[in-house]
A protein has these predicted regions:
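Positively charged n-region of N-terminal signal peptides that target proteins for export
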Residues: 1-4
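C-terminal motif of bacterial Sec signal peptides marking the signal peptidase cleavage site
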Residues: 18-20
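Divalent-metal-activated hydrolytic enzyme cores
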Residues: 22-76, 99, 110-128, 142-229
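Conserved beta-strand elements of the Class I
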Residues: 80-82, 103
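Short glycine-enriched loops at secondary-structure junctions
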Residues: 83-89, 108-111, 138-139
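Catalytic core of membrane glycerolipid acyltransferases/transacylases, capturing the structured
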Residues: 88-105
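Conserved functional hotspot residues or short segments at active or partner-binding sites
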Residues: 135
Length: 229
């Protein structure tokens, strides 16, 4: 498995060598990356990146001035990440990726409960051609904590109360069971994945092996992501 991962990373590194390329050539080469990495290979890239982060050995790729200029002509991310808005979950750092590598959708409780977020997800897959979607929940999620607590009712401004109520729909079996927070966070991740699977167009891509959807659980304490099937 390690040989496979190394091979994938070498291929990615070779493909991302754009010195001397025009903007059009750069765009073509980035598209070429998407065409040559399948969903499982992209997942291995993210797993390896997370190992770098956990062991404080981030490579910090694609963060220089050249990369910034390369991305002006268009974006070609390799994966879509649905994550919580929590400032303690720095998605690109967690997976050791740089500018233009990931299409990130961040909402409270990593929730996909409106047209804006689902539309963003569909855009990433249908127009940017990302082949992997990972929905990442995290340890001690404040949104899910509030959603399963019965002590927050009536104490928050209207907008926050509406947000909590929306999140509560995704963790209904755990309302009033604050001691089950981790279980609720995992359950919520699965509920968001189920929403994705209800989209027939995305489901067709999954069935054809052109798109992979998985869950993740991020540990605040050590930076590790548990990849959930």
């Amino acid at each position: 498995m390690k040989k496979v991962i190394v091979g994938v990373l070498m291929m990615v590194g070779a493909m991302w060598s754009f010195t001397g390329c025009t903007s059009n050539q750069i765009s073509q080469k980035e598209t070429h990356i998407q065409e040559n990495l399948n969903p499982n290979q992209i997942l291995e890239v993210l797993k390896t990146g997370n190992e770098h982060f956990v062991h404080h050995k981030n490579a910090f790729p694609h963060l220089d001035e050249a990369r910034m200029k390369e991305e002006v002509s268009g974006q070609h991310p390799i994966a879509t990440v649905v994550s919580c808005s929590d400032s303690r979950v720095p998605v690109e750092l967690v997976f050791d990726r740089g500018i233009g590598d990931l299409f990130v959708i961040r909402t409270a409780g990593n929730s996909l409960d409106d047209d804006m977020t689902m539309g963003s997800l569909e855009y990433a897959v249908n127009h940017l051609h990302t082949k992997l979607i990972i929905v990442v929940g995290h340890e001690k999620c404040g949104g899910i904590t509030a959603a399963i607590s019965q002590h927050s009712e009536g104490k928050e401004p209207k907008e926050i109360s509406n947000l909590i109520e929306t999140l509560r729909k995704g963790v209904e079996p755990f309302v009033g069971k604050s001691e089950k927070l981790d279980d609720a966070i995992h359950y919520n991740v699965d509920q968001q994945i189920q929403k994705i699977l209800q989209n027939q167009e995305l489901k067709d891509l999954i069935d054809k092996g052109e798109l992979k959807v998985i869950g993740g659980y991020y540990h605040l304490s050590d930076g590790k992501v548990d990849f959930l099937n």
